[in-house]
Design a protein with these regions (language model features):
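A generic structural signal for short, solvent-exposed coil/turn residues
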Residues: 9, 41, 52, 88-90
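Short aromatic-glycine-(Arg/Gly/Cys) micro-motifs in beta-strand/loop hairpins
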Residues: 41-70
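Compositionally biased, low-complexity repeat tracts
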Residues: 10, 21, 34, 69, ...
Length: 102
């Protein structure tokens, strides 16, 4: 059984969280590795897909257990962001928790 981190805030870095998922027990395929200060970013505990107000682009936020953003990936749309997250984290599709309708 997977464990959900606490419910994320409604916004991360000013972007509205549309959906989120725990990554407990999910292997990150690491097709793209995020770096912080020249070192690989730590493995996220959860991911969130979010959209900034007035934008159609979406972001996949890699988050710590307390929902601090560790890294982010930019995508052309919400649908593309979701597919990218599901491709990078096989099994996450069954774990999405919807934060907002529509």
């Amino acid at each position: 059984m997977h464990v959900h981190p606490s419910t994320p805030p409604t916004e991360l870095d000013g972007a509205r969280v549309e959906r989120y998922a725990s990554l407990d027990g999910i292997v990150h395929l690491a097709r793209v590795t995020a770096f912080i200060d020249g070192a690989p970013a730590p493995k996220p505990a959860a991911i969130a897909v979010a959209v900034y107000p007035g934008e159609s682009d979406a972001y996949v936020f890699h988050c710590s257990p307390d929902w601090s953003v560790l890294a982010a990936g930019h995508h052309a749309s919400l649908e593309v962001a979701v597919l990218a997250a599901e491709s990078g984290f096989p099994g996450v599709a069954e774990r999405w928790v919807m934060q907002h309708a529509g």
